[in-house]
From Swiss-Prot:
Belongs to the peptidase S14 family. The gene is clpP. It catalyses: Hydrolysis of proteins to small peptides in the presence of ATP and magnesium. alpha-casein is the usual test substrate. In the absence of ATP, only oligopeptides shorter than five residues are hydrolyzed (such as succinyl-Leu-Tyr-|-NHMec, and Leu-Tyr-Leu-|-Tyr-Trp, in which cleavage of the -Tyr-|-Leu- and -Tyr-|-Trp bonds also occurs). The active site is at S98, H123. This is ATP-dependent Clp protease proteolytic subunit. One of its GO terms (biological process) is protein quality control for misfolded or incompletely synthesized proteins. One of its GO terms (cellular component) is cytoplasm. The keyword Cytoplasm applies.
Length: 199
């Protein structure tokens, strides 16, 4: 069981307490921490849609500290980020690996950030299947299509040639924040909130 801190806000009308994540949501900040799965995806998609309905012209920030997870859950978040009107800024705190790195790179161009000690890792999709040979072949073909699709999007996000992406995701490819900036996964390494120090 995890402990979620409460914060108290005082206004002229009295006090109101929020859990910390609700208070951050009020500031248009979404946290993606831990595994990307159906539950976290549904929560983030709902928050993105809610924030768009509140103000379609104001940016939304997603702070990412995730080892990755489900491709379909991650693609639901990705598609919603592209679908909504507000720009979605992405910030890596800690680690963005696998689907976490994919989502980090999918933020609005010019608004993708990493903190100085963040670590980013890209690799090809993982899959483990068992059953009849024909079923295994169906799943293998599906994962190859997914790999091709993810590589094309990563190529667009980073401005790296598709062949470079294909080679670089063959194995786990770990990068520092500065290396991720040079690669095109993020636009800036920031040390201060706001405009930050451009590295």
């Amino acid at each position: 069981m995890s402990l979620v801190p409460m914060v108290v806000e005082q206004t002229s009308r009295g006090e109101r307490s929020y859990d910390i994540f609700s208070r951050l949501l009020k500031e248009r900040i979404i946290m993606l921490s831990g595994e990307v799965n159906d539950d976290s995806s549904n929560l983030i998609v709902s928050q993105l849609l809610f924030l768009e309905s509140e103000d379609p012209d104001k940016d939304i920030s997603i702070y990412i500290n995730s080892p990755g997870g489900s491709i379909t859950a991650g693609m639901a978040i990705y598609d919603t980020m592209q679908y909504i009107k507000p720009d979605v800024s992405t910030i890596c705190v800690g680690m963005a690996a696998s689907m976490g790195a994919f989502l980090l790179s999918s933020g609005a161009k010019g608004k993708r950030y990493a903190l100085p000690n963040a670590e980013i890792m890209i690799h090809q999709p993982l899959g483990g299947f068992q059953g009849q040979a024909t079923d295994i072949q169906i799943h293998a073909n599906r994962i190859l299509k997914i790999k091709e699709s993810l590589n094309k999007i990563l190529s667009e996000n980073t401005n790296q040639p598709l062949e470079v992406i294909e080679a670089d995701v063959e194995r786990d490819n770990f990068m520092t924040a500065d290396e991720a900036k040079a690669y095109g996964l993020v636009d800036k390494v920031i040390t201060k909130n706001g405009t930050g120090k451009d590295k």
